[in-house]
Amino acid sequence: MPDINELLRWSIANSTAPDTDASEQLQIRFNPNSTQSGTSTLHASDSGPPDISPASTPGPVTPDDGSSLPLPPGTEVPVTKKEDLTTEMLDLILGKGDSITMKEKMAFATDENNSVEDRVEALDDFEMLIELIDNANNMPILKLWDPLLTLLSSSHPEIVAHTCWIIGTAIQNNIKAQAAFYIHETFSRILEIIYPPSSISSYPPSVRAKATYALSAALKHWPLASYALYTATSSAENGYSVLRRGVNDPQAIVRRKMAFLVGTLAMQSGERYEGEIPSEVRNYIEENEKNAPSESLVEGLKREGVFTALVDGLKQGVDDVEYEENAMRALVRAHQKGGLTVSEKSDLKTIWEKWGKQGRQERGLDGEDGKEVSETLSS
């Protein structure tokens, strides 16, 4: 690819009009804009000094008829060879289109002959591109979902983590990309990264956290979230049971995200998607709704014991204020939608009172948020 100096040389060599030959380029024309001389005197009646201005500067005796000063005899006129503007030069000037760059980055990332570090860098670049919703929606057209999903089976944890990160970014708050995610049957594969089958070693916390991020993005605002959790199977577990395990996961980064996700699902339970739905996505949703259970998200979470597991986690006192904040918020939302039993509500109220003013402040639940919790648990 040409460097910037080569590009500048090309632009200079090709910047003249095509009908001007080299000799004309070196001739200098003078067209004074006024009859005013190029020198000045103290009084208007004084005569000006002799013209000693160079040829390039208009003076009193400079030709004013537009004639040219020819080159001295024997002067050789250099011939400039013009070059065609190449694709590489255009790429350097304008930059490659995102679609081309996305395909190149994915091809590089899936090539195992490249180093893991370089492949991860390519995935980083790809993730930045699909932050734009149009690029994320173009992934099916560019046939990039299939090669991306092959990376979920990589033996390198950092490759798997970045793949989950890309998936989460692509589908977050993007119903069209969410549909592509489910069409490619990716949901169960994400669950298996969070809780692999017994025959597969567990992934590091950083990988499982990225997979939980992708799980959250797949469910948030998705009209068929309850259906996805009910039907998806991973190691003989459905999505609801993965959430139940997740809220008490031994790894703090995972259980915090799981508790937050449960709160998000409780909040969106019973709500209808209000955004615009493309026709192809609407057709997919309507077709799958025929087989979907009638239960809401809160009903499914309650049936599977997810709320009970969260209450148990708070009762155990894991010394993790971020987790406890997320769990309390999730359970309050669940109670507001009828998701807690009388016993669970009583246990939650006891925990809330035990925290006291200082404990609530430590967990970010003072002020208006704390007032809402107190009122909800007292109702």
UniProtKB/Swiss-Prot annotation:
UniProt keyword annotations, A-Z: Cytoplasm, Repeat, Translation regulation
Coiled-coil regions listed in the entry: none
SUPFAM superfamilies, per database record: ARM repeat (SSF48371)
Pfam families named in the record: Fes1
InterPro entries assigned: ARM-like (IPR011989), ARM-type_fold (IPR016024), Hsp70_NEF-Inhibitors (IPR050693), Nucleotide_exch_fac_Fes1 (IPR013918)
A Gene Ontology cellular-component term: endoplasmic reticulum
GO biological process: regulation of translation
Entry's localization field: Cytoplasm
Statement: the UniProt record of this protein carries the keyword Cytoplasm: yes
Predominant localisation class: cytoplasm
Placement of ARM repeats on the sequence: 25-114, 133-172, 175-220
GO molecular function list: adenyl-nucleotide exchange factor activity
Its biological purpose: Functions as a nucleotide exchange factor (NEF) for Hsp70 chaperones which accelerates the release of ADP. Required for fully efficient Hsp70-mediated folding of proteins.
Family from the record: Belongs to the FES1 family.
The protein's name in its UniProt record: Hsp70 nucleotide exchange factor FES1
